[in-house]
Regions:
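Membrane-water interface of transmembrane alpha-helices
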Residues: 140-147, 210-226
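Class A GPCR helix-loop hinge within the 7TM core
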Residues: 135-171
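Intracellular effector-coupling site of seven-transmembrane GPCRs
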Residues: 217-262
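Extracellular-loop-to-transmembrane junctions of the mid-late helices
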Residues: 178-217
Length: 324
């Protein structure tokens, strides 16, 4: 099971197996740096494979369309290219990758395993690589967007001096570069690189929690001041409202992705193994469901994006009618 392969890849493997992976490209259990997928017991997870495969097959097209709309409206409208929206577009691009690459390869993996009791190394590598890039970008960007909101609340008007769209765009590109690099370093089959990758995820998740707690304190203070009839500037109120919107998006991300991270931490640091491989499939699927849910939360909470999409959809429909 690739779920098991994904999250147990942090275990150390003997040098003999590592050196012969390339020569045995298509033998069960031998696929470069990925560990044995335990195909000999695939029948134990056949039902879960089918259910999670169907769930992801249904949600994948929606994730593609919804996140593509988010990326399109933000990238095509300068008025929407604020620092926070650029980071939201980065998150949407990550979710778009899930719909285009990760979920289809997951579905192929599950159905092939059920049909043949074996999945080729190419499919396993495609799924694993896409998964780790997506997961790393998501957690890193969550921290970045949380930091951006905290700076907006702390520095007020000076915020625009420190945080500019161009700088944020460069940061988003750097986030993608670093996570692609970390994923590529897995090919070294070195436990140190894998540990660094996992430690990075954990670090950014912890940073996100700390920052969101600080933001919550600021928002609570702001609401108390309103009750005491000490109104703040309209700019301040707008930043607080946007911080609440971003916090909602972050909360949804964490709820759906935390189970996967906990399983990974359990393997790496506690060396625990969950007997039912089905659990891995469900935690992965929960993370993928978030890629379809997140654009809905974004559209619901961010009025400017919701309005832009409402304007774009009729135009796209008219264009499609003209083509026909």
């Amino acid at each position: 099971m690739e779920s098991f392969a994904n999250f147990t890849f942090f275990h150390n493997f003997n040098s003999t197996n590592a050196s012969t992976n390339n020569a045995r490209f298509d033998l069960p259990g031998d696929c470069f740096h990925l560990p044995d997928a335990k195909f000999q017991v695939f029948h134990q997870r056949a039902q879960t494979n089918l259910v999670t495969g169907v769930v992801n097959a249904v949600l994948s097209p929606f994730a593609v369309v919804a996140n593509l709309l988010i990326v399109f409206v933000i990238s095509s409208r300068p008025s929407l290219q604020s620092p926070s929206n650029i980071l939201l577009a980065c998150l949407a691009a990550s979710d778009l990758q899930v719909g285009i690459l990760v979920q289809p390869s997951y579905v192929a993996y599950r159905l092939l395993e059920n049909a043949h009791g074996f999945v080729s190394c190419a499919v396993r590598m495609l799924y694993s690589t896409g998964f780790y890039v997506y997961y790393g970008v998501s957690f890193t960007t969550l921290s970045a967007v949380s930091c951006e909101r905290l700076l907006a609340l702390i520095f007020h008007m000076r915020y625009y001096t420190y945080v500019r769209p161009g700088r944020v765009l460069k940061a988003a590109i750097f986030i993608w570069f670093v996570n692609v690099l970390f994923t590529a370093l897995q090919w070294a089959n070195n436990g140190v690189f894998r540990g660094i990758h996992l430690a990075t995820w954990t670090f950014f998740l912890a940073i996100t929690f700390i920052i969101q707690i600080k933001i919550l304190q600021i928002i609570t203070q702001h609401q108390r001041q309103i009750k005491k009839q000490r109104p703040k500037s309209a700019q301040r109120q707008m930043q607080v409202k946007l911080a609440i919107n971003i916090a909602s998006i972050v909360a949804v991300y964490v709820i759906f992705n935390l189970p996967v991270l906990l399983v990974t931490l359990s393997h790496q640091f506690l060396f625990r193994h969950i007997d039912s491989y089905n659990f891995y499939s469900w935690t992965e699927t929960a993370a993928f469901v978030n890629s379809s849910l997140n654009p809905l939360v974004c559209i619901w909470r961010v009025k400017a994006i919701r309005k832009a999409i409402a304007e774009v959809l009729p135009k796209l429909r008219r264009t499609e009618i003209r083509r026909k």
